[in-house]
């Protein structure tokens, strides 16, 4: 093993008043100059630590010593030591761009010449230069310069210059015998052999080609034209930084540090900011503003107390340990994130939020400040403690990651984040509340024995019927929802967005009358003045009980109808599933088929699979009907009524999958899904009087695409629309906008990339052929489930899950239901059975859509199908059995899947006693990460101006619709019309005489619809600002204006439109432009 060279070395960064490259070449060629060399910074090898690591002596004023005598004494001592040890002194210049970082350590200085000061005069001159910044004369340098070591650095460059300047070429030919040379020019080989190196070689080239030599050296030494100001600004701003950072970054980062050589200059300066070792004032009395020459800069740096002594000696170790402490904290954060990446089952968006939050919690302003205080030292003796004093990791664990771990246990999650608000009622009042706030039992009874009673028609006839009904009720005190078109700016009218797609605006009908809102209001209203029930007036006969369900029916060609049904023959729709043999026998026989030895989740999943497989059905007609009354039995969507109580928890589940899922594993996953639901309900409905092991959860799966569809998808194109598994129709009724947060949360994208034509007579659910796997003794139960036939869904898989609210509870309002769905989402992803079955195939862990729980939103019922643009019927929702572990009657449980009372939001409760009504789940059941982001934003971010404060400054009350609308008409509309005239000149004329109507008022956002003024027969729509449409689609777009405050505290107005055309997103709200409002006008 080679021994380390004990020869001591010193490296000096030098500068001159003139061109440093020219001066250096003069020295290398043996020419003496009248100028001297200034030392800007220097470094020494470890063999000289005892020499330069001693603290310089301060003058003893009591003994009459001055700075000059102290300087002489220190210089003499240093000169003696240098003369004794004779270190090799390399004089260096900058090499490469200063300040950047690199993946690998790179030398930042390059030596120009090497000296050994072997005389007392030379050693003392060097000592005065290093300790006091005196210039070193060229004569002294020439006497001490060692040519062998110096020109060993430059001989290669000298040869390269000789070859290029003499214009020589390499020989041609592969062998020596075939070698050919250009007779007019010499060869490279001859030039290398014949040209001398060393001082004579450099002098020869320099004399004949001075400019080329200067250019080559300047490029090699990075065009070194630095100035004192450059050094002060680059390495400053203080004495400590300019002395210590210059030395460490240029010299010590490569020689002493293990990892410091890869950090940039700013990082080095940041390290030194926490290196608070005190030092005496600079003896020169100068500051950085005085450093206008290299002479002053050299004196300032060399006489600084940071240039030598324990402070200078300990810096490399401090930087190493400081880097170690920083990296340990950052690595801990990465370790936590890596661990949570596998265990934290949240949506992709939430996981991204989690990563940002984790970094914010670890590296926010306070955390970093505390960490920097912990790693700051004032005594070099305290360096070793900095790796253990930081609380950055410990504080992050306690304040953030411990809270994240709570999210991984549903019981802790609910205990910390959920605080249900329960209203306790006497049994008599509770029963009356349930009777008034849920559907009449006859509307969801399988067979009432009487003819169906209800109304069902398309939008235009329904609107006319509603006008007549409300006009009839107006004399009894009914408040009409129709608004006179002569008052478009009224604040009492119904919100827009209600016109059905495919139905043109009829003359005389205000576009502000929401069909679903009016129907929901009539269907759920009590008798007017205690006499006339609005539902009776709607049906035209007495004795009609209420409330009644309101449905939306999808028709071909994107049309739709609406229905209110008081009683119906549900058996014509739900009793289409034939069950050969008894369900119980089929269920219990599943063990024998599989050969399972014990009852566990795998065996129960297998029996669920057998029961689902034995259920066959009859598909609907091949094409949808244009007759609304007939189509109602093919497609039916319940419209959510926020004024009624909720008796069934209905979940719209859409799984995004990476590949096909074996049906056995899917049944196993749904058992885990059920377990998550039951766990949530048992914790929230703590007073429920039920047996949770036998409590029903009804699952319905969207039918798989048939074989014909897969053939079309793989081969020829089809004119049929994409097959959709889960997300419901994009019908946007007026009332959805009453909950803007729910609107944002709702997704509209297609679910399956399949095209479909149901022409076979076989139920789509039966398209998944689930023959039992061959018995193989070596396979585990889980492997047997994994070997079952796969579901035909390849990208998306839709489910509808319904769970009766356990007695004696009811839910009141959409907020409680939306919160419960979000908690169930959290509980399901924490269920081990579910995650182990589905984790590898799920694209996202956000699969329960909570946007459907808004007034006026519709959700398709089980046993009904979807309707394509061309009238084809597909995607029916059919039972997917998940039998409770302790089910008392399997046949009854299977039959209950067809009971409409189990899959309507507002069906009459099956239990007679209601004593608890949950109005809100309270607490912070929203995502922990969302809550954390909101709190951090409030605590850290600058307080932004609110919309209320901006309007108040204009003497407008945000609580007064009339005042806000007047402000918009007087101030905002003028700027909007001016902008339209500039950028949309063809459509701007439509906005010359318009008014506004308030739709939604939020604390930070107000949405208004722009209405045309004029008579009732004038079209209320506007031209689309995004695209040109055919004549039939012109003038049907609705325009909205919203005002809000931006992040800079400015009042902004946005124009949005909703166009019914397909190319514009089928009724999708789209922002056209946003502008700043000049309130000074």
Curated annotation (Swiss-Prot):
Region span, Disordered: 484-508
Compartment(s) of residence: Host nucleus
GO cellular component: host cell nucleus
Record keyword Metal-binding present: yes
Signal peptide: none
UniProt EC number: 2.7.7.-
Swiss-Prot/TrEMBL site (Essential for primase activity) positions: 652, 654
GO biological process: bidirectional double-stranded viral DNA replication; DNA replication
Gene Ontology MF term list: DNA-directed RNA polymerase activity; zinc ion binding
Keywords, alphabetical: DNA replication, Host nucleus, Metal-binding, Transferase, Zinc, Zinc-finger
The keyword Ubl conjugation is assigned to this record: no
Class in the EC hierarchy, top level: transferase
Superkingdom field: Viruses
Biased composition range(s): Polar residues: 484-497
Chain positions of all zinc fingers (CHC2-type): 1024-1064
Subunit structure: Associates with the helicase and the primase-associated factor to form the helicase-primase factor.
Function: Essential component of the helicase/primase complex. Unwinds the DNA at the replication forks and generates single-stranded DNA for both leading and lagging strand synthesis. The primase initiates primer synthesis and thereby produces large amount of short RNA primers on the lagging strand that the polymerase elongates using dNTPs.
Record family assignment: Belongs to the herpesviridae DNA primase family.
Protein name: DNA primase
Organism of provenance: Equine herpesvirus 1 (strain Ab4p) (EHV-1)
């Amino acid at each position: 093993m080679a021994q380390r060279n004990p020869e001591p070395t010193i490296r000096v960064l030098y500068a001159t008043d003139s061109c440093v490259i020219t001066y250096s070449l003069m020295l290398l060629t043996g020419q003496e100059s009248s100028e001297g060399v200034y030392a800007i910074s220097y470094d020494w090898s470890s063999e000289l630590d005892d020499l330069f690591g001693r603290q310089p002596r301060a003058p003893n004023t009591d003994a009459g010593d001055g700075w000059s005598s102290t300087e002489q004494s220190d210089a003499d001592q240093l000169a003696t030591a240098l003369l004794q040890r004779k270190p090799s002194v390399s004089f260096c210049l900058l090499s490469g761009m200063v300040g950047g970082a690199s993946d690998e350590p790179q030398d930042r200085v390059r030596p120009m010449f090497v000296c050994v000061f072997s005389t007392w005069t030379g050693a003392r001159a060097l000592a005065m230069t290093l300790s006091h910044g005196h210039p070193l004369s060229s004569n002294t340098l020439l006497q001490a310069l060692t040519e062998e070591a110096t020109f060993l650095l430059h001989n290669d460059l000298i040869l390269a210059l000789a070859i290029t300047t003499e214009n020589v070429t390499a020989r041609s030919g592969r062998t020596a015998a075939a070698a050919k040379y250009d007779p007019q020019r010499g060869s490279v080989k001859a030039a290398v052999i014949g040209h001398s190196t060393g001082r004579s070689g450099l002098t020869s080239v320099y004399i004949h080609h001075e400019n080329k030599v200067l250019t080559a050296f300047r490029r090699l030494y990075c065009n070194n034209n630095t100035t004192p100001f450059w050094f002060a600004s680059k390495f400053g701003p203080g004495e400590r930084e300019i002395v210590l950072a210059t030395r460490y970054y240029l010299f010590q980062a490569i020689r002493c540090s293990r990892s410091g050589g890869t950090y940039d200059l700013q990082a080095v300066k940041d390290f030194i900011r926490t290196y608070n070792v005190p030092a005496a004032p600079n003896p020169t009395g100068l500051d950085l503003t005085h450093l206008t020459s290299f002479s002053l800069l050299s004196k300032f740096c060399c006489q600084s107390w940071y240039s030598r002594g324990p402070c200078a000696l300990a810096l490399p170790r401090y930087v190493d340990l400081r880097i170690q402490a920083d990296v340990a904290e950052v690595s801990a954060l990465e370790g936590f994130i890596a661990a949570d990446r596998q265990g934290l089952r949240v949506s992709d968006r939430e996981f991204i939020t989690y990563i940002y939050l984790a970094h914010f919690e670890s590296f926010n302003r306070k955390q970093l400040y505390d960490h920097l205080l912990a790693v700051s030292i004032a005594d070099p003796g305290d360096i070793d403690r900095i790796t253990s004093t930081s609380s950055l990791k410990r504080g992050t664990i306690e304040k953030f990651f411990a809270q994240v771990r709570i999210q991984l246990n549903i019981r802790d999650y609910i205990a910390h984040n959920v605080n249900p608000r329960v209203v306790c009622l006497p049994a008599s009042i509770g029963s009356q509340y349930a009777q008034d706030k849920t559907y009449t039992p006859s509307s969801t009874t399988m067979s009432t024995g009487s003819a169906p009673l209800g109304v069902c028609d398309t939008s235009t006839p329904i609107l006319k019927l509603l006008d007549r009904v409300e006009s009839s009720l107006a004399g009894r005190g009914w408040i009409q929802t129709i608004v006179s078109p002569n008052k478009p700016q009224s604040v009492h009218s119904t919100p827009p967005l209600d016109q059905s797609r495919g139905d043109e605006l009829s003359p005389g009908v205000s576009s502000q009358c929401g069909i679903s809102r009016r129907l929901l209001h009539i269907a759920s209203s009590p008798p007017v003045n205690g006499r006339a029930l609005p539902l009776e007036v709607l049906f035209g006969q007495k004795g009609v009980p209420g409330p009644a369900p309101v449905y939306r029916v999808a028709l071909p060609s994107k049309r739709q109808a609406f229905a209110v049904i008081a009683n119906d023959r549900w058996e014509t729709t739900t009793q289409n599933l034939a069950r050969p043999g008894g369900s119980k026998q089929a269920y219990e026989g599943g063990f024998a088929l599989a050969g399972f030895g014990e009852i566990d989740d795998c065996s129960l999943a297998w029996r669920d699979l057998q029961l689902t497989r034995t259920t066959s059905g009859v598909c609907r007609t091949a094409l949808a009907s244009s007759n609304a009354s007939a189509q109602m039995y093919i497609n039916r969507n319940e419209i959510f009524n926020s004024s009624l109580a909720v008796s069934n928890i209905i979940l719209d589940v859409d799984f995004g999958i990476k590949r096909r899922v074996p049906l056995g594993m899917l049944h196993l996953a749904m058992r885990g899904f059920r377990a998550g639901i039951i766990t949530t309900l048992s914790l929230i409905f703590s007073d429920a009087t039920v047996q949770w092991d036998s409590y029903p959860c009804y699952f319905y799966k969207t039918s798989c695409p048939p074989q014909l569809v897969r053939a079309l998808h793989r081969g020829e194109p089809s004119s049929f629309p994409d097959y959709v598994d889960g997300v419901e129709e994009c019908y946007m009724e007026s009332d959805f906008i009453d909950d803007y947060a729910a609107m944002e949360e709702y997704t509209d994208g297609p679910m399956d990339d399949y095209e479909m034509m149901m022409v076979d007579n076989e139920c789509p659910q039966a398209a998944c052929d689930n023959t039992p796997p061959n018995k193989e003794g070596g396979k585990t139960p889980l492997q047997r489930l994994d070997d079952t036939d796969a579901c035909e869904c390849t990208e998306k898989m839709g489910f509808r899950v319904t769970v009766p609210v356990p007695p004696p509870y009811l839910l009141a309002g959409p907020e409680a239901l939306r919160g419960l769905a979000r908690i169930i989402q959290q509980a399901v992803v924490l269920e081990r059975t579910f995650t182990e079955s589905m984790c590898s195939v799920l694209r996202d862990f956000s699969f329960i859509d909570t946007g459907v729980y808004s007034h006026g939103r519709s959700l398709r019922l089980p046993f009904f199908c979807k309707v394509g643009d061309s009238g084809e019927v597909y995607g029916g929702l059919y039972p997917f059995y998940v039998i409770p572990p302790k089910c008392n009657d399997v046949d009854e449980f299977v039959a209950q899947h067809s009971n409409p009372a189990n899959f309507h939001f507002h069906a009459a409760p099956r239990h007679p006693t209601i004593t608890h009504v949950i109005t809100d789940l309270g607490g912070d059941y929203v995502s922990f990460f969302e809550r954390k982001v909101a709190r951090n934003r409030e605590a850290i971010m600058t307080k932004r101006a609110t919309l209320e404060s901006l309007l108040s400054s204009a003497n407008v009350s945000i609580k007064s619709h009339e005042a806000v609308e007047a402000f918009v008409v007087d101030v905002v509309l003028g700027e909007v019309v001016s902008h339209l005239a500039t950028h949309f000149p063809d459509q701007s004329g439509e906005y010359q005489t318009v008014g506004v109507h308030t739709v939604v008022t939020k604390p930070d956002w107000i949405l208004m619809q722009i209405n045309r003024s004029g008579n009732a027969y004038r079209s209320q729509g506007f031209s689309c600002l995004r695209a040109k449409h055919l004549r039939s689609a012109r003038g049907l777009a609705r325009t909205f204006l919203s005002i809000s405050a931006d992040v800079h505290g400015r009042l902004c107005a946005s124009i949005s439109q909703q166009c019914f055309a397909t190319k514009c997103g089928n009724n999708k709200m789209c922002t056209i432009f946003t502008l700043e409002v000049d309130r000074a006008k």
